[in-house]
């Protein structure tokens, strides 16, 4: 009897980055096993759907939901949740999330599908992350003489057959990960209180831990993050980062992105209020109702976001 593999969806979200989306589609077309469903969520950018429709093969089940900005800010969490619900509605049991900047290696879809199919079906949810290498700037030679993409030092590549459990859930990055539809629902998806850039990945890791789940790093599911310029620290997102850091600290009782916040402070961009909260020096981001930053193209989630469990002056929120 032939056993049919569970239906697998690749989900990406995009605003701008049309050339990078085209690169991702080329990478998906080169897979040994392609996606059964391809979900491309456009954020305030109808051209994203045009690119996906023009370049995706006719035999793919292409789904193209969309969402707008919220208070002038990018609803990254809500867009990912919309992508997941669209994929599940199309019958997908396995979900692979790829940042729009990421081009999958030829074995990524098959490897993620293999790992998810081996899920025990009991215990807490599992989230699986493959490694991501970063394409160097076109004018620079890269890390080595061959100019090949470089891996983040916190995420060195694993052998193709390796599976490694990771205790530090703050190492979860949404650039490339896979999860069963059931486990995504058990985690609760991404928290939609976060708007714009920053902290939503760290929050998802905390949700995974709270649900009794496990983070796994695997080999054989690599991707390449296509280059785009991004300053460090990401000063273009300072307002979003301050708002989202406060949201996170209210919820979890410790500060994410501590290094970035301190670097912003050293540059005179932010300060700590007497109550312990962070605020931009123009007062633009005192909390989640602040005006936020002007919209920017979708960032590739660095995610060099440093996290810190330094206790804030806010009350620690107990994990449920």
Predicted region positions:
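Active-site donor/metal-binding and catalytic loop motifs
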Residues: 217-234, 248
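Glycine-rich, basic loop-to-helix element that forms the pyrophosphate-binding segment
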Residues: 69-88
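Acidic donor-binding segment of Leloir-type glycosyltransferases
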Residues: 29-69
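Short, well-formed alpha-helical segments that are part of the catalytic scaffolds
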Residues: 17-30
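Short beta-strand-to-loop acidic/aromatic patch adjacent to the donor-nucleotide binding site
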Residues: 92-103
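A short, conserved alpha-helix in the catalytic core of glycosyltransferases
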Residues: 171-179, 183-188, 193-221
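Short, flexible, basic/aromatic active-site loop/helix in glycosyltransferases
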Residues: 131, 147-170
């Amino acid at each position: 009897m032939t056993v049919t593999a569970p239906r697998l969806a690749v989900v990406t979200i995009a605003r701008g980055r049309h050339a990078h989306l085209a690169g991702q589609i080329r990478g998906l077309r080169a897979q040994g096993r392609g996606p059964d469903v391809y979900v491309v969520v456009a954020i305030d950018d109808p051209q994203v759907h045009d690119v996906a429709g023009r370049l995706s093969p006719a035999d793919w089940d292409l789904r193209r939901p969309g969402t707008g900005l919220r208070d002038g800010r990018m609803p990254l969490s809500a867009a990912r949740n919309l992508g997941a619900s669209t994929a599940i509605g199309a019958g997908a049991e396995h979900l692979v999330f790829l940042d729009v900047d990421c081009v999958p290696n030829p074995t990524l879809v098959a490897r993620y599908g293999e790992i998810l199919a081996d899920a025990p079906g009991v215990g807490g949810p599992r989230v699986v992350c493959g490694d991501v290498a970063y394409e160097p700037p076109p004018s620079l030679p890269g890390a080595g003489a061959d100019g090949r993409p470089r891996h983040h030092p916190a995420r060195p590549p694993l052998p193709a057959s390796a599976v490694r459990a990771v205790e530090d859930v703050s190492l979860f990055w949404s650039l490339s990960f896979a999860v069963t539809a059931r486990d995504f629902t058990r985690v609760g998806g991404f928290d939609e209180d976060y708007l714009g850039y920053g902290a939503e990945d760290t929050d998802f890791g905390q949700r995974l831990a709270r649900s009794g789940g496990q983070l796994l790093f695997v080999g054989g599911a690599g991707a390449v993050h296509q280059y785009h310029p991004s300053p460090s620290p990401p000063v273009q997102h300072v307002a979003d980062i301050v708002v989202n850091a406060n949201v996170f600290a209210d919820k979890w009782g410790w500060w994410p992105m501590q290094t970035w916040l301190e670097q912003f402070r050293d540059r005179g961009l932010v300060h700590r209020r007497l109550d312990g909260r962070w605020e931009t020096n123009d007062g633009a981001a005192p909390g989640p109702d602040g005006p936020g930053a002007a919209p920017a193209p979708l960032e590739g989630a660095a995610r060099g976001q440093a996290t810190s469990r330094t206790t804030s002056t806010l009350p620690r929120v107990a994990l449920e």
